[in-house]
Design a protein with these regions (language model features):
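Surface-exposed acidic, glycine/proline-enriched linker/cap segments
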Residues: 59, 113-132
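Conserved Class I SAM-dependent methyltransferase catalytic core
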Residues: 57, 126-199
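Conserved S-adenosyl-L-methionine
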Residues: 1-93, 98-111, 165-167, 173-176, ...
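A general structural signal for short secondary-structure junctions and capping/turn motifs
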Residues: 79-85, 89-92, 96, 132-134, ...
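Short amphipathic alpha-helical segments, especially helix-boundary/capping motifs
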Residues: 29-36, 116-123, 155-160, 187-190
Length: 200
């Protein structure tokens, strides 16, 4: 209901072949048309797998959006953020779950040496809280990356749709990265819904 005429930036930090980006663009265009608004949509994505990255980039080129293909980056979102100074209107992802991100962690200086501002938050007068999760599963870090790219000064703000398995709801003890990410979301009142899907 809040889609007004204007420019919207859509981001997927685990974009694969770009399918979710394409569906998001088509959905926004349809909603804008139904409301009689004129929108310009720019897609941004990052993919670590060279083959799926190439498919995504080629798909955007084939759609005739040559410059837009420059907005698809090839590297790990966790250790090599392709869009460090960007904020986005809409963000979505289906990141890998249960997949180790130890290589990224080592590349970033390890748990004690990492200084990436995407993965550290401050709560009131408390010392900084680390959002670094256990190295065996980095899915919540993809969400923390998106939270760091939210627009906070516009009326619409940002909207995030993120696909997870159930472990994101309960892993990590109090004070650990997973718990700190959930706390950050709840204390900022960013959560609108959790939708559980059936198996298969």
């Amino acid at each position: 209901d809040q889609i007004e005429s204007g420019t919207y930036l859509v981001y997927d930090g685990a974009c694969g072949t770009g399918g979710m980006l394409t569906v998001a663009e088509e959905t926004l265009q349809r909603l804008a048309q139904e409301r009689g608004t004129d929108v310009s949509i720019h897609l941004y994505g990052q993919e670590v797998n060279d083959k799926t990255y190439a498919i995504c980039k080629a798909d955007i080129l084939l759609k005739g959006a040559g410059e837009a293909a420059d907005n698809i980056k090839d590297d790990s979102t966790l250790s090599a953020d392709g869009f460090p100074a960007h904020e986005f209107d809409f963000m979505l992802s289906n990141p890998p779950y249960g997949k180790s991100w130890k290589t990224d962690l080592d590349r970033m200086g390890g748990k004690t040496g990492m200084r990436d501002p995407r993965f550290v938050v401050h709560h009131a007068d408390e010392p900084e809280c680390s959002l670094i999760t256990r190295s065996s599963d980095g899915q919540l870090l993809f969400l923390a990356n998106k939270l760091s790219k939210m627009k906070r000064t516009t009326a619409l703000g940002s909207r995030i749709a993120h696909v997870h398995n159930g472990s994101s709801l309960f892993t990590g003890d109090a004070g650990q990265g997973e718990s700190n990410i959930r706390r950050w979301i709840i204390e900022n009142d960013w959560l609108e819904a959790i939708v559980a899907l059936p198996e298969n």
